[in-house]
Amino acid sequence: MTFCLLPAFTQAFCGCIFINPLTMSATLSRMDCCVGLPHCMGWLPSPVGAVAFVMEGALPIPWSYYLNSYDKHVLQQLDCLCLFPVTCYQSFTSYVTGDEVWSLHCHCGRQGSLQVGPRRLQCLAAAKVRELVVQKFLLGTRFNEYYPQYRVHANRYVNPGLEYVGSVWCGKHFIYVRADGAEFARLKGLRARLGQGVLFCESLLSCYVVIVCQQCACPPTDAQVDHCMRLLSFTLRRWQNLLLGRSGSSPLIPGFDIPRNRTERLRQRMLHRFYSYRTPIYRLTYLRG
């Protein structure tokens, strides 16, 4: 996984990340189609690697980069291209044990089998198709279980408010960065300086900045993962400096840059124990540090 910066490494120094800019506005408009009253379509088990997203309560799916043109057309006809199709309703219990489930919802305006109407069978059929598509995407979170060091290195020099959460590997590498409300709004205002391939996904539960990497090799190798996480660390540091009104990616004091954000280091230890030994994570400790 090379972040698409390997063939054009000079773009990294401009904060540019990786996708055709001509498709950006069209992509966001197609994905933002959560209209109508939602209703539950089914439940999906949560993989072990998705525990960090369970803590956030929601996981956006960039459909235009995940699906091919035919699948995207079919799901669009079925009103299935909601940007946040799954939420974790069991994410507010005291402990996260790995037995959580994701709720899959639809915006077709019907209540599935609870309401008889002209679109009832279509909704039920769409639910089965959508379950397969979303479950495959959720399985891509196993990347976080296989490469726990990725988060450690990516968040090494970042402050609270702009942190890498996890990745989804499903044909492409989808990188999820969580931003607090104020930081999220400021980053949107700096969108022109962040570069290409940066998607902003906002819901009531969380705010994500999603980076889509199109040229990472499949399957990933250890060397590619190491290179990818170094470039992400560089990018996050540059974004942080932009928010602080500084240019470049240099530390605040030249020659002196130590790891910070103790809350994030505590979360990393809890995630490591969960991935290795399935040790339950106490929610309040994880969220508050």
Curated annotation (Swiss-Prot):
Protein name from the UniProt record: Probable early E4 33 kDa protein
Cystine bridges: none
UniProt-listed Pfam families: Adeno_E4_34
Keyword annotations from UniProtKB, A to Z: Early protein, Host cytoplasm, Host nucleus
Gene Ontology cellular component annotations, sorted alphabetically: host cell cytoplasm; host cell nucleus
Superkingdom of this protein's organism: Viruses
Description of how the protein assembles with itself and partners: Interacts with E1B-55k.
Role according to the record: Plays a major role to prevent cellular inhibition of viral genome replication by nuclear bodies. Assembles an SCF-like E3 ubiquitin ligase complex based on the cellular proteins ELOB, ELOC, CUL5 and RBX1, in cooperation with viral E1B-55K. This viral RING-type ligase ubiquitinates cellular substrates prior to proteasomal degradation: p53/TP53, LIG4, MRE11-RAD50-NBS1 (MRN) complex, ITGA3, DAXX and BLM.
InterPro entries: Adenovirus_E4_30/34
Miscellaneous note of the record: This protein is the product of two different mRNAs spliced from the same primary transcript.
Keyword Glycosyltransferase: no
Subcellular location: Host nucleus; Host cytoplasm
Species assigned in the record: Murine adenovirus A serotype 1 (MAdV-1)
Protein family per UniProt: Belongs to the adenoviridae E4 30 to 34 kDa protein family.
Principal location class: host cell
